[in-house]
């Protein structure tokens, strides 16, 4: 089975909490704080595996979670870092955020990897908060929360040349002749239900990868037939070989087929439509009127397609010349990465350390993940903790933003269940 799309849930590891601890040893008075930091949570990392060819594995397992960081401990013992979780994906995998449908990564090289969910940073232990005026802090930071999201994986074949054309025009036969690939071949439409790859090796030219893409029909750009499943794989190729049944044994007009396929390419992507295209007039061994080929060639050339080859995949007539021309064209076209527009690119939002302020009557309400994290770290009933609390609010710009909003002495500031009067 060929699976080329998948949707999975990923969750990184939470950062370990910092420790609140004081040194307690016989004969050592006032040992001081010795709480260690929490460990970092594990990342979820997508890693290219060149041996994988489909996304089939993700139909059986859809949820992936990395290891959390260990909590800090006394004696300045740091928590253990959580292990990263590596998820193998095939080359040519596009990673998208499921919520926004924006592209996060294009994993198209053997060494490619991408951190799709970052582990939370470990919280600082209380030994980190000592100052000349705060000798015994009894607070520590909690670990940063984990990241979690649903992501979509789309596999796009990494082939140099794509064979396109209506069903049953001989694409699979051509692939089997020019490579060692053995696709299913039969005399009915949509025999090929998944893309097949083969390596073309001809003396005197560089080897290249060719893909037999499932047949396209009218309306494919709107999802008809194999539709978008077909077109997704054509995007990666640098050269297209447009296979036409010149014999018309099924009653179709070759020129009409040529126009319809190119119209679908153009509807789907202008860049795809403009890609170099070689026309392969196949099944010429069944053509009994040579004028029909010349007439077809003349019409096609008027559209700017000057590379028209009369071939027979069944008898191998003209096939070598066709492949040599494909190799020549490839040598003139550099390999480029998938272009991702700014509109389509996923922008990571920092959700783990944010806040917002709104005003209700004379009360200013500060809320968000920043507030939750700060209040979890301090004891608001302790004077030392409160001094640290106000220092953090000032350093993070909360006080400045409150003043810009017009706060006055005596106005109430609320952070979750904790309230205090604002004083300049």
UniProtKB/Swiss-Prot annotation:
Its EC number is 3.6.5.-. Pfam families: DUF1967, GTP1_OBG, MMR_HSR1. One of its GO terms (molecular function) is GTP binding. Residues 345-424 form the OCT domain. The keyword Magnesium applies. It is found in: Cytoplasm. Residues 159-331 form the OBG-type G domain. It is an enzyme of class 3 (hydrolase). It comes from the Bacteria. This is GTPase Obg.
């Amino acid at each position: 089975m060929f699976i080329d799309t998948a949707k999975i849930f990923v969750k990184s590891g939470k950062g370990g909490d910092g420790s609140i601890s004081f040194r307690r040893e016989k004969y050592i008075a006032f040992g001081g704080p010795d709480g260690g930091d929490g460990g970092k949570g594990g990342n979820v990392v997508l890693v290219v595996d060149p041996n994988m060819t489909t996304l089939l594995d993700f139909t059986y397992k859809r949820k992936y979670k990395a290891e959390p960081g260990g909590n800090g401990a006394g004696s300045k013992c740091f928590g253990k870092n959580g292990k990263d979780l590596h998820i193998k994906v095939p080359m040519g995998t596009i990673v998208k955020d499921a919520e926004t449908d924006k592209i996060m990564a294009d994993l198209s090289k053997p060494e490619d990897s991408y951190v799709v969910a970052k582990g939370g940073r470990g919280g600082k232990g209380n030994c980190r908060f000592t100052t000349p005026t705060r000798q015994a802090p009894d607070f520590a930071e909690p670990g940063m929360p984990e990241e979690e999201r649903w992501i979509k994986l789309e596999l796009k074949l990494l082939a140099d040349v794509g064979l396109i054309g209506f069903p049953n025009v001989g694409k699979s036969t051509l692939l089997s002749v020019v490579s060692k690939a053995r696709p299913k071949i039969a005399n009915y439409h949509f025999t090929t239900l998944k893309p097949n790859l083969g390596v073309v090796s001809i003396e005197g030219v560089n080897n290249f990868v060719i893909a037999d893409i499932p047949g396209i029909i009218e309306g494919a750009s709107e999802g008809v037939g194999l539709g978008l499943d077909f077109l997704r794989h054509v995007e990666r190729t640098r050269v297209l070989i447009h296979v036409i049944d010149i014999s018309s044994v099924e009653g179709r007009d070759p020129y009409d087929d040529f126009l319809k396929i190119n119209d679908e390419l153009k509807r789907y992507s202008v860049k795809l439509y403009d890609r170099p295209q070689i026309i392969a007039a196949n099944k010429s061994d069944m053509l009994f009127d040579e004028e029909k080929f010349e007439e077809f060639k003349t019409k096609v050339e008027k559209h700017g397609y000057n590379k028209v080859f009369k071939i027979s995949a069944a008898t191998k007539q003209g096939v070598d010349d066709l492949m040599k021309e494909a190799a020549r064209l490839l040598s003139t076209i550099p390999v480029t990465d998938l272009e991702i527009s700014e509109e389509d690119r996923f922008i990571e939002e920092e959700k783990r350390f944010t806040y917002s302020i709104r005003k209700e009557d004379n009360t200013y309400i500060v809320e968000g993940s920043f507030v939750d994290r700060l209040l979890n770290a301090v004891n608001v009933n302790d004077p030392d903790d409160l001094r640290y609390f106000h220092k953090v609010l000032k350093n993070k710009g909360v006080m400045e933003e409150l003043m810009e909003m017009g706060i006055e002495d005596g106005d109430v500031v609320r952070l979750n269940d904790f309230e205090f009067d604002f004083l300049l």
